[in-house]
């Protein structure tokens, strides 16, 4: 992996920002705190050994403005291609224009495939007309991509796992029996975070080498019956830490910035989702 000279970072949570800064200092990596306005970013380029860690919309705005940023990881198509016995449901990746026809008269879960948008969060829709109404209200561009899932999973707990290759490097619970994340949630009697990380490791071990992403954030749920399922896949450089080991998270962030990753894993952000 390349030796980086700077970690360019903007993290909204003061606690997470401090944790990442200390992790970088432990390996002798200087940190450049990015300004609130992307237009003020100057002199930082991936080609010069800069690693990036910031919200997807912020980085999308920088890329649209011509800043050299090269990031890699598992994208929506990788998630949609996982087998049903891993995800627990049927998952389709479709354009906004195609999505209502795919949903038809049946209920489904709909969410944006990449990043977040304040006008369109993951939602349970009753049918195609319900989805059309939500899309009309959100005013998403016609070329936006959605993930459509055939049902909502009833979960007892949820977990976040950062990976590099086939290896989980940091993990944490973020919901356990209805209790939202706090620093003490890791000690909840019903938290199965280590088992969730093992589930992810076994899942990645079963994939062909060419289908293992260089890095990923894999969110996993556990049902009341004790079954694990992959809920979604997020970008390493923009995902929250919860109680994940910041040293492991930093390793994953640097892996996502590695220019030697295969081209198929290069992040191609949707311009409409810029900050």
Give names to the regions the model predicted.
Residues 114, 151-153, 222-224, 234-237:
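Short, flexible loop/turn elements at secondary-structure junctions
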Residues 211-213, 224-275:
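C-terminal active-site "lid" helix and adjoining low-complexity regulatory extension at the edge
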Residues 2-205:
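Active-site nucleotide/adenylate-binding loops and adjacent lid/helix of ATP-dependent enzymes
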Residues 149-150, 158-159, 212-224:
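A short glycine-rich, hydrophobically flanked beta-strand micro-motif that places a catalytic Asp/Glu
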């Amino acid at each position: 992996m390349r030796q980086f000279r700077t970690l360019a970072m903007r993290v909204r949570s003061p606690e997470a920002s401090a944790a990442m800064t200390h992790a970088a200092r432990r390996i002798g990596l200087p940190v450049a705190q990015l300004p609130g306005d992307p237009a003020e970013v100057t002199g930082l380029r991936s080609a010069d050994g800069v690693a990036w860690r910031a919200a997807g919309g912020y980085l999308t705005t920088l890329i649209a403005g011509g800043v050299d940023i090269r990031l890699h990881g598992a994208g929506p198509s990788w998630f949609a291609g996982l087998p049903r016995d891993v995800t627990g449901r049927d998952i389709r990746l479709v354009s906004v224009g195609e999505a209502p026809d795919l949903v038809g008269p049946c209920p489904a879960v709909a969410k944006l495939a990449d990043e977040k948008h304040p006008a369109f969060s993951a939602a349970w829709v009753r049918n195609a007309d319900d989805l059309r109404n939500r899309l009309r209200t959100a005013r998403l561009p016609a070329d936006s991509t959605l993930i459509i899932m055939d049902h909502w999973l009833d979960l007892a707990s949820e977990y976040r796992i950062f990976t590099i290759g086939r290896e989980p490097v940091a993990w944490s619970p973020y919901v356990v029996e209805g209790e939202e994340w706090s620093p003490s949630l890791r000690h909840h009697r019903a938290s199965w975070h280590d088992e969730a990380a093992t589930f992810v490791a076994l899942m990645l071990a079963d994939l062909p080498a060419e289908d293992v992403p260089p890095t990923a954030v894999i969110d996993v749920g556990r049902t009341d019956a004790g079954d694990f399922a992959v809920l979604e896949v997020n970008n390493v450089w923009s995902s929250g830490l919860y109680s994940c080991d910041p040293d492991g998270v930093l390793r994953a962030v640097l892996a996502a910035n590695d220019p030697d990753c295969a081209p198929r894993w290069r992040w191609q952000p949707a311009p409409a989702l810029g900050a």
